UniProtKB/Swiss-Prot annotation:
It is found in: Cell inner membrane. It comes from Aliarcobacter butzleri (strain RM4018). F-type ATPases have 2 components, CF(1) - the catalytic core - and CF(0) - the membrane proton channel. CF(1) has five subunits: alpha(3), beta(3), gamma(1), delta(1), epsilon(1). CF(0) has three main subunits: a, b and c. Keywords: ATP synthesis, Cell inner membrane, Cell membrane, CF(1), Hydrogen ion transport, Ion transport, Membrane, Transport. This is ATP synthase epsilon chain. Belongs to the ATPase epsilon chain family. It holds the Pfam family ATP-synt_DE_N. GO terms for molecular function: ATP binding; proton-transporting ATP synthase activity, rotational mechanism. Produces ATP from ADP in the presence of a proton gradient across the membrane.
């Protein structure tokens, strides 16, 4: 099965580093998906949820903003702030979801629909 290498890094360290089937990113101009063999690009990311589809599971990471570099074999995300929504025990996930909502609300960009991002975060609860 074809996969692509995804890494998500913040100033505090690495959040995710693994092979994935697909990844959906919150681009500045709208969400976009990346599959193995994708054309090379660099894009700004806005507040939202990165949805990671692995071979056997789906994970999610909330970010406040960042940048992504995509090529045929890898996706490298540099985010200012990121919180894994689906890793750990149920109590840790609940804490992470609350922390993700705080991260989203810290963004003061009027072009962002905070309610839409919070709804997506809640879908992983």
């Amino acid at each position: 099965m074809d996969t692509i290498k995804l890494s998500i890094v913040t100033p505090n360290g690495e959040i995710f580093n693994d092979d994935v089937k697909t990844v959906t990113l919150p681009g500045k101009e709208g969400e976009f998906g990346v599959l193995p063999g994708h054309s090379s690009l660099v894009s700004s990311l806005t507040v939202g949820v990165i949805v990671i589809e692995k071979v056997d599971s789906t994970e999610a990471v909330a970010i406040n903003w960042g940048h992504v570099k995509v090529d045929e074999k890898s996706v490298d995300v540099l985010a200012d702030g990121a919180i894994a929504l689906t890793a750990g025990k149920d109590s840790e996930i609940a804490k992470n979801i609350e922390a993700a909502k705080e991260l989203v609300n810290s963004v003061k960009d009027s072009n962002i629909s905070v309610a839409a991002v919070e709804a997506k975060i809640n879908s992983f609860a």
